[in-house]
Amino acid sequence: MDLSELDPHVVQLFPSHALAIAKNKILEMGAITVEACENVREYFISKSSTAKEAVEELENAINLLDKKISEYLLLISHEQLNDHDSKEYFADMKSIKDLERVGDLCINLTQFFEAVYDEKDDFSSEAKDDIIAMINMDIEMLNHAMVAFDKHDLDDIIYVDDHESNLDYYNKKAKQRHIQRVTNKTEKSVIVNSTYVDILSNLERIGDHCQNIAESYMLEEENFKPDYEVDSAFNQ
């Protein structure tokens, strides 16, 4: 992670180039955030302390990038920016905050899992399946969100929007299945019962941030409508 690339001298001379440098760092931040999500999944599945420590280290890197890129973008904002660069600036500022929040949610998830594992307890196989499915959806969405952020590609934006709707629906159904297990007394762990809904909510919130990132640039367009005429395609 080379932060020396965020050279303040470039800002005054070539603000558009400085924005490109910042964007590359945000893409790097996105890749680190994906890696954090992957290690959350690994920790959940294997209970590996190495994976848990990796999440913590990656989250520290995400926080550092958030701070340094934000400072760099603030310098850029003081320069005269054309319309395109202004949109890039606002999209960049929003996206780094969404990535930082995903990093926080990754830490939340590892803490929930750790609370269960420290009690020598575990999740039911059905609960595990739902959590893994949602983590997998989050990782796929984040990958596509970063492509949408980079390329402003409508197909990737639609992909993320579509899957965010699917994630919301899956979250609702997973909660219903959990309530059924508690009612039937097939989910016996007290700590799992007390944390499971929070885990699902954190996973759903990651999806929300992915959608924000995917739409970050397009939302700066005056005529952009987040639902863009694709609702009919979703309902087919």
Can you describe what each PLM-predicted range is?
Residues 1-236:
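Cytosolic, long alpha-helical scaffolding segments
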